[in-house]
């Protein structure tokens, strides 16, 4: 079994893979991996990968250093099954690269746009030759809602869920519709622009936020909430024998 530890900005995910098939995923705190010991005792773990976008505290570091299996710590020097053309690989978030790796692994030989809608919204492009060209970073849903409240004098902090007319009928619905529809139009705009350059483009959508697209757009999107975990597992398998 492969142990995949994905430590993000808000939560940590601990997943188990049997070769390429995900068996279980547990959501945990990124400040203390309380589920780690139970997961390791439950499965026959042979190797692990750790990927983090935050600085780990002493508690989490101690837990990870006690793992009784070889551990691959993902960094900018880790060999990857794609060609990384990013000019500053040391600044590239592991989650961005892992999502690209997973998408390319599923559809090698295809031009792919990977959209990850989480704390931030990222747009990544990998071409049919397996070359990762880079991507863009945009504020995520909660970040936009919070910014409107934090950087203005009177706008309230609005929850993402709730009534959302085409045009806001009050301040709350104006903010909700403005932010959520703005994100949807942003995403559809990226897809349209990329498909103009790459007519056979495939699109993957992952991340914690869910958006409603029209039926035509849904037909060109592969939605996969666990794309990053699958990519980390692919990277771990690719480095088998190096750890």
Swiss-Prot record:
UniProt keyword annotations, A-Z: ATP-binding, Coenzyme A biosynthesis, Cytoplasm, Kinase, Metal-binding, Nucleotide-binding, Potassium, Transferase
Necessary cofactors: NH4(+); K(+)
Record GO cellular component, one term: cytoplasm
Protein localization: Cytoplasm
UniProt binding sites for K(+): 116
InterPro entries associated with the record: ATPase_NBD, Type_III_PanK
Function: Catalyzes the phosphorylation of pantothenate (Pan), the first step in CoA biosynthesis.
Protein name listed in UniProt: Type III pantothenate kinase
Origin species: Bacteroides fragilis (strain ATCC 25285 / DSM 2151 / CCUG 4856 / JCM 11019 / LMG 10263 / NCTC 9343 / Onslow / VPI 2553 / EN-2)
């Amino acid at each position: 079994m492969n142990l995949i530890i994905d430590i993000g900005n808000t939560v940590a995910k601990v997943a188990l893979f049997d070769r390429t098939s995900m068996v279980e995923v547990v959501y945990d705190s990124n400040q203390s991996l309380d589920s780690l010991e139970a997961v390791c005792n439950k499965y026959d773990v042979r190797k692990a990968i750790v990927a983090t976008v935050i600085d780990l505290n002493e508690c989490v570091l101690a837990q990870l250093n006690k793992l009784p299996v070889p551990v691959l710590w993902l960094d900018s020097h880790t060999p990857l099954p794609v060609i990384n053309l990013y000019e500053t690989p040391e600044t590239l978030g592991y989650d961005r690269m892992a999502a690209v790796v997973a998408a390319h692994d599923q559809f090698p030989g295809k031009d792919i746009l990977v959209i990850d809608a989480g704390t931030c919204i990222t747009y990544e492009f990998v071409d049919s030759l397996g070359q990762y060209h880079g991507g863009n970073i945009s504020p995520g849903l909660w970040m936009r809602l919070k910014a409107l409240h934090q950087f203005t004098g009177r706008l309230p902090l609005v929850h993402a869920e709730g009534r959302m007319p085409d045009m806001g009928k009050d301040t709350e619905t104006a903010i909700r519709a403005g932010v959520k529809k703005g994100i949807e139009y942003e995403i559809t705009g990226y897809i349209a622009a990329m498909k103009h350059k790459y007519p056979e483009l495939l699109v993957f959508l992952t991340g914690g936020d869910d958006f409603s697209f029209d039926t035509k757009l849904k037909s060109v999107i592969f939605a996969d909430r666990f794309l990053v975990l699958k990519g980390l597992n692919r990277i771990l398998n690719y480095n088998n024998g190096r750890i």
